[in-house]
C-alpha cells in the first residue's frame, strides 16, 4: 500500500469508517480501492472476533471483495469500504462496524425502547418507523421491547436524529416528571404555572382577534374553548395550550424537550419553522444543545394529516437532507412528505392556520395553493397590491368575494410576536413591537419598503423595521 496525501475515490478508512480530510495521509491500495488512515494502519486487524451476544460462533475476517449483504444491517458494501467478517460454520456475514451495535436503544419516534432482533424468516414483515419502507425479514431489525407492532431498520434506528446509539441493556428507564402545568381548582377554574398571580376560568367559544394565546401566540377566532384570567389582565390560553405536557419527545430529536413558559423580555427562533416567537417553547435541557420548538411545531407527530393533502404525511428523509416544499418552494431539512405520491410540506406551511379573518371581508379566508396554475390566471394581493403566484407560494383566499392575500401580508413576517412586546436583544438593545395602524406606513430602514404588516419594530434609537429579520440584517450590516 502506498502512503498518499491526495484525493482518491475512497477517502474513507475501511477500518474505522472515518472520512480522511484532504490534507491527511492515508494508506491506499490502487488495485482494490482499500484505504486505511494512519492511526488504523498501526493497529493489527483482528482476524478473529468472538462476540456471543451477536453470533454464537467465532467470526473470521473475510479478506475478499464481496457484494454480500450484512446480516445485521442488510446493506451491501458496493464500494468495498467496510471490513467484512463471516462465520465458517453458518451462512452469516457481518460488517465489522455492526458487530458491536447496541442491543437496546432509546429512539425519538417511539415511546418505548427498542431491542435488536436477528433475522426471522417466519416473522411477518413490518414497515420501518423511520423510512416507512418494508423491513426485510432476512436481516436484523430493532423492535419494541413492550410488544408493540413497531420496528426499524438497523441502519435507520441508529441515525443521529433517531438514537444516540447508547447501549441501554440492563439500564433503568429514565423517569421524567410529566405532571400537569396547572392545578385544577374545580368548576372550570385552574391555576396555571405560567400565570401564578391569578386564577383562570374556562370560557366557551371565545372570540377576540385582537388578543393572542400566550402559548402559541395565535389570535382567538372563536373556534374553541379558552382559559381566561379572572382578573383584569389579558392573559388567555387556548384550552389545548393549557393542557400542554411538561415533557415532550419530538420525533426529530433524541433528547426529551421541556416546556419553557413565555418569553416576556426576549424571543426565540423555532428550530423547524424558523419563525420568531415570544410564546411557550419546548427546549432541550442538555447543555450545549440548542433545540427550541414553538408549541405548534412541537405538536406535529406522525402520521400527520393536513387539510391540503389527502394522504397522511411522514418524515422519511434523513438528517441534513433538504427537499423543497410543494407550497412555498422553500428547501427545509427533513420536511413532512407523502410516501404514496411524493408531496412535500415544510413545517412553516404545516403550522399555518387553516382559516383566518381579514378586516375588509365578512367571510373567513382559507389557506390554499395551486400545484399547477394557468399562465393566464392572475392573482392580486389586496394589501401590498402585488401579484401572487399560487404555484410558488401559498395564499389566503375568499372564494365568495374573490379576495386573495399573501400569507405574510395577512399574518405578518412575525406572526408569533405580539404588539406591545418589548424584547431585549443579545446586544442589550431594547426593541419595541408596536401596532402599525397609521394611515401613513413607515419605511423600513433595511428593505426600504413601506411596512405592510400589522406590527412594526422600533428601536431605542428610533429606527423602524418591518420585521425581526430586517432588524437582524441591519445589525449584520453594521
Predicted regions and their residues:
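Cys/His-rich zinc-coordinating "finger" modules and their low-complexity flanking regions
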Residues: 1-478
Amino acid at each position: 500500500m502506498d502512503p498518499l496525501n491526495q484525493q482518491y475515490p475512497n477517502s474513507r478508512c475501511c477500518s474505522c469508517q472515518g472520512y480522511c480530510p484532504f490534507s491527511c495521509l492515508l494508506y491506499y491500495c490502487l488495485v482494490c480501492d482499500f484505504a486505511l488512515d494512519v492511526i488504523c494502519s498501526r493497529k493489527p486487524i483482528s482476524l478473529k472476533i468472538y462476540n456471543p451476544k451477536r453470533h454464537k460462533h467465532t467470526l473470521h475476517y473475510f479478506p475478499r471483495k464481496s457484494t454480500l449483504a450484512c446480516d445485521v444491517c442488510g446493506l451491501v458494501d458496493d464500494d468495498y469500504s467496510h471490513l467484512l467478517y463471516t462465520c465458517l460454520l453458518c451462512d452469516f456475514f457481518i460488517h465489522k462496524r455492526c458487530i458491536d451495535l447496541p442491543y437496546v436503544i432509546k429512539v425519538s419516534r417511539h415511546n418505548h425502547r427498542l431491542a435488536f432482533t436477528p433475522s426471522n424468516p417466519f416473522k411477518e414483515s413490518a414497515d420501518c418507523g423511520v423510512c416507512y419502507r418494508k423491513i426485510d425479514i432476512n436481516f436484523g431489525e430493532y423492535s419494541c421491547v413492550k410488544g408493540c407492532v413497531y420496528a426499524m431498520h438497523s441502519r435507520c434506528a441508529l441515525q443521529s436524529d433517531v438514537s444516540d446509539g447508547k447501549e441501554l441493556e440492563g439500564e433503568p428507564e429514565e423517569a421524567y416528571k410529566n405532571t400537569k402545568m396547572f392545578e385544577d381548582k374545580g368548576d372550570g377554574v385552574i391555576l396555571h404555572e405560567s400565570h401564578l398571580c391569578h386564577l383562570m376560568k374556562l370560557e366557551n367559544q371565545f372570540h377576540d382577534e385582537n388578543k393572542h394565546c400566550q402559548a402559541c401566540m395565535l389570535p382567538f377566532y372563536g373556534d374553541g374553548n379558552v382559559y381566561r384570567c379572572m382578573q383584569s389582565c389579558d392573559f388567555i390560553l387556548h384550552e389545548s395550550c393549557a393542557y400542554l405536557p411538561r415533557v415532550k419527545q419530538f420525533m426529530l430529536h433524541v433528547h426529551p424537550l421541556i416546556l419553557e413558559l413565555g418569553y416576556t423580555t426576549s424571543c426565540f427562533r423555532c428550530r423547524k419553522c424558523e419563525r420568531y416567537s415570544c410564546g411557550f417553547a419546548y427546549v432541550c435541557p442538555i447543555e450545549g444543545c440548542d433545540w427550541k420548538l414553538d408549541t405548534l411545531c412541537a405538536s406535529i407527530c406522525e402520521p400527520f394529516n393536513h387539510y391540503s393533502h389527502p394522504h397522511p404525511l411522514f418524515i422519511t428523509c434523513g438528517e441534513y437532507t433538504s427537499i423543497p416544499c410543494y407550497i412555498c418552494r422553500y428547501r427545509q431539512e427533513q420536511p413532512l412528505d407523502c410516501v404514496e405520491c411524493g408531496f412535500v410540506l415544510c413545517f412553516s406551511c404545516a403550522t399555518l392556520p387553516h382559516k383566518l379573518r381579514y378586516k375588509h371581508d365578512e367571510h373567513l379566508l382559507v389557506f390554499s395553493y395551486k400545484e399547477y396554475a394557468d399562465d393566464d390566471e392572475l392573482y392580486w394581493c389586496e394589501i401590498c397590491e402585488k401579484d401572487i403566484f399560487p404555484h410558488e407560494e401559498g395564499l389566503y383566499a375568499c372564494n365568495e368575494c374573490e379576495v386573495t392575500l399573501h400569507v405574510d401580508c395577512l399574518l405578518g413576517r412575525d406572526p408569533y410576536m405580539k404588539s406591545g412586546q418589548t424584547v431585549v436583544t443579545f446586544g442589550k438593545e431594547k426593541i419595541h413591537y408596536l401596532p402599525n395602524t397609521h394611515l401613513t406606513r413607515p419605511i423600513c430602514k433595511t428593505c426600504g419598503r413601506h411596512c405592510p404588516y400589522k406590527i412594526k419594530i422600533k428601536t431605542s434609537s428610533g429606527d423602524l423595521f418591518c420585521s425581526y429579520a430586517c432588524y437582524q440584517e441591519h445589525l449584520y450590516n453594521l
